Amino acid sequence: LIEILMACKQEGNPDMVFKFCSTSKVSFPGSGVAAIGASKKNIDFIKQQMTIQTIGHDKLNQLRHVRFFKDIHGMVLHMRKHADILRPKFETVLNGLKNELGDLEIGSWLEPRGGYFISFDALPGCAKAIVAKAKEAGLVMTPAGATFPYGKDPQDSNIRIAPSYPTPEELAVAVEIFVLCVKLVSVDKLLEEK
């Protein structure tokens, strides 16, 4: 991936981007340290706004993070631990999708290189029905279209799969249920279109 701030600067548009990040899913959920990256002009603007919005940042929480991570190398080591925990979970889901849906042309997905989600695209008009059918079977998922503004997916096709919480064993069962729901809803959709 290109570094977007540098790319915008090189193209003469340094003020187009604000980058936000947080350690919220890395360290303490809901208590992470956040950061903003932007051009000097945009950072100056943000500082003006924040001056009147906050008395001061949670310095004890910042200190807690510095003591825990120490430096960028500590952050990298910690993220490798996260990857070691998440990798088998993602592999379980991705292998299930590939083995059960790979050649059927009723869904596609992105294999993420980081992050906490797998983006699955069903046939248009099927995502809400798939999530509803999964819920009937006891599998609770992120609402269909959650990746779109206001949750309104114009194609009703996107489902965000979040494999980080369940165990790999629970995920194996969840994937079986999910792919079965994808197949059932897709068959209904294809028969409806004939």
Residue ranges of each PLM-predicted region?
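Conserved PLP phosphate-binding loop immediately N-terminal to the Schiff-base lysine helix
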Residues: L1-I4
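Short, conserved active-site loop motifs that form the nucleotide-linked donor/cofactor pocket
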Residues: V17, G107, L139
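Short, solvent-exposed loop/turn elements at beta->coil junctions and helix N-caps
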Residues: C21-S24, I106-G107, G145-Y150
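Conserved core segment of the aminotransferase class I/II
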Residues: M6-R87
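Conserved C-terminal alpha-helix-loop-beta "cap" of PLP-dependent enzymes
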Residues: I43, K47, Q53, F117-R160, ...
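PLP-dependent enzyme catalytic core of the Aspartate aminotransferase-like
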Residues: N13, E136, K152-K194
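Short beta-strand segments
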Residues: C21, A35-G37, L110-E111, F117-D121, ...
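Conserved glycine-rich beta-strand-loop-beta hairpin in the small C-terminal domain of fold type I
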Residues: R80-L94, I106-D121
